[in-house]
Structures are given as C-alpha cells and as structure tokens.
Swiss-Prot record:
Its EC number is 2.7.7.48. This is RNA-directed RNA polymerase catalytic subunit. The lineage of its organism: Viruses, Riboviria, Orthornavirae, Negarnaviricota, Polyploviricotina. Residues 286-482 form the RdRp catalytic domain. It comes from Influenza B virus (strain B/Panama/45/1990). Influenza RNA polymerase is composed of three subunits: PB1, PB2 and PA. Interacts (via N-terminus) with PA (via C-terminus). Interacts (via C-terminus) with PB2 (via N-terminus); this interaction is essential for transcription initiation. RNA-dependent RNA polymerase which is responsible for replication and transcription of virus RNA segments. The transcription of viral mRNAs occurs by a unique mechanism called cap-snatching. 5' methylated caps of cellular mRNAs are cleaved after 10-13 nucleotides by PA. In turn, these short capped RNAs are used as primers by PB1 for transcription of viral mRNAs. During virus replication, PB1 initiates RNA synthesis and copy vRNA into complementary RNA (cRNA) which in turn serves as a template for the production of more vRNAs. Phosphorylated by host PRKCA. Pfam families: Flu_PB1 (PF00602). It comes from the Viruses. GO terms for cellular component: host cell cytoplasm; host cell nucleus. It catalyses: RNA(n) + a ribonucleoside 5'-triphosphate = RNA(n+1) + diphosphate. GO terms for molecular function: nucleotide binding; RNA binding; RNA-directed RNA polymerase activity.
Amino acid sequence: MNINPYFLFIDVPIQAAISTTFPYTGVPPYSHGTGTGHTIDTVIRTHEYSNKGKQYVSDVTGCTMVDPTNGPLPEDNEPSAYAQLDCVLEALDRMDEEHPGLFQAASQNAMEALMVTTVDKLTQGRQTFDWTVCRNQPAATALNTTITSFRLNDLNGADKGGLVPFCQDIIDSLDKPEMTFFSVKNIKKKLPAKNRKGFLIKRIPMKVKDRITRVEYIKRALSLNTMTKDAERGKLKRRAIATAGIQIRGFVLVVENLAKNICENLEQSGLPVGGNEKKAKLSNAVAKMLSNCPPGGISMTVTGDNTKWNECLNPRIFLAMTERITRDSPIWFRDFCSIAPVLFSNKIARLGKGFMITSKTKRLKAQIPCPDLFSIPLERYNEETRAKLKKLKPFFNEEGTASLSPGMMMGMFNMLSTVLGVAALGIKNIGNKEYLWDGLQSSDDFALFVNAKDEETCMEGINDFYRTCKLLGINMSKKKSYCNETGMFEFTSMFYRDGFVSNFAMEIPSFGVAGVNESADMAIGMTIIKNNMINNGMGPATAQTAIQLFIADYRYTYKCHRGDSKVEGKRMKIIKELWENTKGRDGLLVADGGPNIYNLRNLHIPEIVLKYNLMDPEYKGRLLHPQNPFVGHLSIEGIKEADITPAHGPVKKMDYDAVSGTHSWRTKRNRSILNTDQRNMILEEQCYAKCCNLFEACFNSASYRKPVGQHSMLEAMAHRLRMDARLDYESGRMSKDDFEKAMAHLGEIGYI
C-alpha cells in the first residue's frame, strides 16, 4: 500500500502534526539513589517564596513556622506566596454571587456524604505513610495498623464503621499524653550454620508494643513522607512528591469532596471531568468567548503556566476558603472541614534516606541518615549540598525532618486549589475597563481568554489578571505563558485549533505489550487502539499500522511467530508441531502461532470469541478446559482492569474484556518478601481473603448492600446461616438431624 505521506496533511491544520513531534517511545527516566536532595530543595524553595512572612515557633512541636498570608505585596515579577486573605474572600464572594446557592448545596452534599462514608473509604489509595513503622505501606495496611494501635489506647471509633467516629478518634489521639502502638522489631538469633562452620544470624520479625510521647506522636501524625517522582519526561531534574499519613487522609477526603461538588458546577473548571467530557466543556468555553467578542474587536487566548503552583499556595488560604464556603453549615461540619488545612499548616516533611559521602581517599562510602546531617562537619559534603544544608538549618528538626508550614505538597487539594484558580478567572474585569476575561482551570494548568476592542486593551486585561493572581498567591509565569488569537491554544495537553487536534502520540508508550499474560495483553493492546480511534482522533490508516506493529511486538515478546515462519527456537518447535497437526489453522490464537485476523471492524471482540468457530474441536477443548488449575477462571470472567501509562499524566485504569483460556495464567508472588518484616502483612492479607471467601459463600452477590448498622461480619454470617437452615428444614430440604447439628455448630461459635 503506497501512500504519499504528504496527502495525510492536506486540509489539516499544522497543529495536527503534533503527533509526529512527540514520539515518546523509550523508557522514561527513573530516579535512583537518595531523594533527600530533592526534598531539601522543595523545603528551601517553599520558604524562599514566603520568607517575608511572619515567623514564629509552634507551641506544640517546637518547629519554626512561617505565615506568608497578608505579607508584603510584590514589587517585581518574581514568584511570591503572599496571598491577601481579604482578596481571596472577596473573590469567593463574587463566585457566590454568580452561582447563588452553589456553596450551600456543595456543603450540604459533602456533609450528607460524610455521614454515610465508612472507614473503608480510606483503604482506597496507594502508598500511605504509616506512623507505626515510619515508612510507606499500602493504604489498607496503614489503616489497619492505625486502628489496631488505636484500640490499645481505648479509641474504638473505627468499630462503629463510620468515618466520623474514626476521625473523632484521631482528634482524641492528639490529646493523649502518650500513645501505645504495635510496631515490628527484628530479633536477631544466632543459629549454627548447617553446611559450613560458624553461625548464621537469622532475623525474626516480632510484633511488639511500643510507646511514644504526645509530642512525638503529633510529629508523626503531621509527617509527610517524601519520595522522588519517577518516570517524568521532558525535565532534566527530578522533583520530590509527598505521601500523607492516615491521620490527615480522612480530613483531606472530605474537603476535596466539598471542592469537587463546587468544581462540577463551575463551567471554568477542568476537574473532575476528563476525556471527551472535558473537551466538550472546553469547546463550549471557546464558543462562548467568541460569541461575546465585541464587533470589530479581538479575542486572545493565553496558554498559561504557573510558577511553582503548589509551593506558593498556603494552607491558611485553604482554611479561609473552607470557612467561607461552609459559612451556612452546622458548626461541627465547619470545624471538621477546618482540620485538614490546620494540619497542613503544621506539616513536617521527612527527608528520606540521607546523603552518601565518601572518605577523602575515595575508598570508603557511608550513608549519613537524616538525623545526623548536621552532626558531621559540613566540609565533608560537596559544595552544592553544603549550600543546601546551610539554608535548611533554621527549619531542621533533630529527628531528621524539616518544618514546612507554607506551601502544599503535590497531589493534595487539587480540587480546592482549582476553586481558587477559578475564583481568579471569575473576576472577569477590574475597574470597569474595556476588556473581559474568562478561562479554564485544572489544578495548576490554565487557559485565559480575553476579549477587547483592540490588542493593547487585551494586553491590559492580561496584565490585570496577572496582578489579580498575585493577590491570591498564584504566580502566572510571564516567560512560559504565550498568547495567540482565540482558536489556538493548549490546555492539559489537549491542543486546540478550531477544534481539538488529534493527539495520540501521548498514548504511544502504552501501545506496547502490557506484560500481564498472553490473553490479557492481546485484549489490552486492541482496546487501546480502539480507544484511541474513539477518543484521540487516530485515523484508520494509523490504526491499521498500529495493529500490525502491535502484533509484531506481541510475537517477539512471547516468541510465538506464525507456525509457517522460519523463526527457530524452543517455543517455535512446539508451535510448528501444533501447526502441522491442526486443520483449522485460522483458529489458532496468535500466541499459539496462528495468523492475526484483527482489523478495524473487529477490534472490540476478544480473540478467543473471534476465532471460536474456526478452531479444531480438540484444540478448543484444550484451550478452554474448565478444570485447568493454572487458570484463575473466577478472576478473569467478564471485565478486567489494567493500568495504562501514557507519556503524560497519571497512570490510567482501563477496562478490557477477556475470556479465560490456557493463556490467562497468573504469576506467583515474589517469594523474597517472606523473609522480611512485611511477612505479617502477607499473612494478614491471606487471612482477610479467607474471611471474604467465607462471607461470599454465605451471601450470594445479589444480596450485597452497602453496610449500614453495627453488625460484625461474624454476626451477619451466623444470622444468615440460621435463616437458611430454618428455611431448608421447614421446606423439607434438610433433615431434622442435620438441622440440629447446624444449630449446635452455630451455638459453639456463640451465636444462637
């Protein structure tokens, strides 16, 4: 098929070529070594933006705090964090006037949602800083260790099931003179070595009770653990990201839910919608601006970029915002919403692993953990690190953490910060001048539209917007923002020119083989191509090419070339033998050396379904054997989810259809974890899995409801089994003897 590539771009704006300029196919850069340097950079930068604010020392933690709100107004274009509280409140007042009843409705909905939210909501989420072991754990594990430790201190709110009583426990825990908790300690045992002389030292993890004082506990509760952000393209240097602990999570959740309710009803907000819904919102905004443009006037669009969005924002502004938004709510809910910002304005950053230094002779290396950073002479560090440490000194605590009262960490309060950005966009005009502005905001990304009679007035509007933002602690970057006539801009990596330009290059990294298993990988590969045709404007010629490239990649990955190919190899020997003995060769899966019959018409059909009628009966029987022990039939039925990593933005979850067959194998867990102190975690996980299986055996899935009331799982199961036994006995399906035995068993457990 000879196509002159020039034809592809006839009648297409030049922006459509964006896909050709963005071929991110390689492996993205990952960080290695210590993240301490990046975290210290963040701490120093954040304090520099706020350095003219009020400084004081916290009564509770003894940390040095900085409050930049209502600080001096900037005299230059450098980024600064001096938000003026009255300006923030006035911007919110205007938002309230423009959207009457929005704040009350959002608060009411958030409050009602909070009342029925259960504690298990906190198990959603990835890594969470666990205060009992001072490191990151999966969210569910961190919640579990917290609840079990709380019980030791007579805090049993979690047993009631609701999020509110658990949050009440968190508040109470901050007042306890000391906290007891379970931690894991390694006990070293000397054992004689079997196969050689001498001894082996075996580490045995033990669960032990431990105590910490109130101040120590508060410091841990306020700590954010920091890591280096991985796989970030297009940047030379890495940056730090933070993980909050379980104490902060519950409160943040409610505030973010409140802000989400507001964002959903603001036409300028790019959150929480995504994909095609977001594109529709953007197209509407553009159309609205163009229709409002004065006759003979001009409409400009700024593709905006904010300098250090997170580091110039301040929790104290968020406190003022939640207070203003919940103004008409009950006092308990207002208090509840104010906790998250208060905790954040006292937050403490953990600095990570510390630095590695080498001896003068370069022979010896040593890791200096964070608590000891200042206990060795500064001359031992290189110049860059020495300069960092000198600036860090005023905010350093002896436990190896740093006080970080100003600034927000990445990923926290995305919705609420969007509300702040939209508030700036909603002001529209200052001093009744001859221009109007409007725009779109999604976390730290924005697009600004300005309408005016001529270019100079447009520029005046943009400058006024720039100054307005400064009053709210938002710093629009004059170097990185650029201005065009409306109809051409970029917002959240969506490129617009008289409509959205197709941009599937972003998705190119995810076109490869996912690496789950042969069956899932084929389904995922085809689904991604299908989704890109639907959502990202990928054309038929490109899609056809993508299918062929994917199949080639798939065959190379799993070493399963066509049965009639000349490729040699262990697996190919078996495949060729199968090829020889098969009549319906079109029915062989690609993973078994069969041909590819995917094209643009049948992308959405799982391969097994597509080839079902072409298969030889004995091949079909082997492929779809229901008793095959290597296939987890239950876990593969119906829709599954895969994690897809595009070049930009977060990992996306994607649904795909898969039919379980011989190629749907499950891999075993890595066994090296069994010798670490996380072994307890695995044993607990297995225990939970057994409980859940037992529960599912008692209740068929149709009778699941969201739990209300205070029953334990045990009570619910016993109750259900009693009912079932009685019904079976009364209808004659169960003998009297069996019925009495069943009741006796339930009696032994203590429920009758």
